Swiss-Prot record:
Record key words, sorted: Auxin signaling pathway, Nucleus, Repressor, Transcription, Transcription regulation
UniProt record similarity statement: Belongs to the Aux/IAA family.
Protein name: Auxin-responsive protein IAA12
Cited Gene3D superfamilies: Phosphatidylinositol 3-kinase Catalytic Subunit, Chain A, domain 1
Subcellular location: Nucleus
PROSITE patterns in the cross-refs: PB1
Boundaries of every PB1 domain copy: 124-217
Result of altering P74S: In bdl; gain of function. Affects auxin-related developmental processes
Induction (UniProt): By auxin.
GO CC terms: nucleus
Annotated spans, Disordered: 44-74, 220-239
Length: 239
């Protein structure tokens, strides 16, 4: 009986001891539990807070360099964009200068051409040409010739190269100026006088010629005694 009573007494004392321990644990560990259940703030981590504040202040104080900025798509550095714009501007300026030089050269060339074909400078342009024995006259552009020889060649091809005429048999090529043909080349000046072609300088001739005529030497003998004398000397002194 004694053993049973001690066991019962021991069992009855267990809840009281456990409650005592639980109460002591809550009373002793209450402060620690409150600390563990509280929400942490930046004040609990002073080192981290100072680091973030330092980084934010550094980012706000120093702005990135302008050369690192990107423009457009695909991204292009601002300094490269500026260089491209400057290059384009320089190319445009050079192109304008080149166009200006070309225009100046072209204007000079046009002036030269106008001086060459200007009738006031280089004669009257087209003049009428007649030949004895040929009823149809022709016209020749005086501005297209640079010498008496060129003019004589053109006229000989016009008239003596025609088929069905007797003149082709009488006149040899390039004989209108040397006095060895039965025909000579004459012209009428602005004053209405007939003269032999070749007695005056070429520029004076083209500025004064009004029309041309290929006439026989018999009719032209009174126009150019010098040419007739030259012809007589050639006959007397054959080469």
């Amino acid at each position: 009986m004694r053993g049973v009573s001690e066991l019962e007494v021991g069992k009855s004392n267990l809840p009281a001891e456990s409650e005592l321990e639980l109460g002591l644990g809550l009373s002793l560990g209450g402060g620690a539990w409150k600390e563990r259940g509280r929400i942490l703030t930046a004040k609990d981590f002073p080192s981290v807070g100072s680091k973030r504040s330092a980084e934010s202040s550094s980012h706000q104080g120093a702005s990135p360099p302008r050369s690192s900025q990107v423009v457009g798509w695909p991204p292009i550095g601002l300094h490269r964009m500026n260089s491209l714009v400057n290059n384009q501007a320089m190319k445009a300026a050079r192109a304008e200068e080149g166009d200006g030089e070309k225009k100046v050269v072209k204007n000079d060339e046009l002036k030269d051409v106008s001086m060459k074909v200007n009738p006031k400078v280089q004669g009257l342009g087209f003049v009428k040409v007649n030949m004895d024995g040929v009823g149809i006259g022709r016209k020749v552009d005086m501005r297209a010739h640079s010498s008496y020889e060129n003019l004589a060649q053109t006229l000989e091809e016009m008239f003596f190269g025609m088929t069905g005429t007797t003149c082709r048999e009488k006149v040899k090529p390039l004989r209108l100026l040397d006095g060895s043909s039965d025909f000579v080349l004459t012209y009428e000046d602005k004053e209405g006088d007939w003269m032999l072609v070749g007695d005056v300088p070429w520029r004076m001739f083209i500025n004064s010629v009004k029309r041309l005529r290929i006439m026989g030497t018999s009719e032209a003998s009174g126009l150019a005694p010098r040419r007739q004398e030259q012809k007589d000397r050639q006959r007397n002194n054959p080469v």
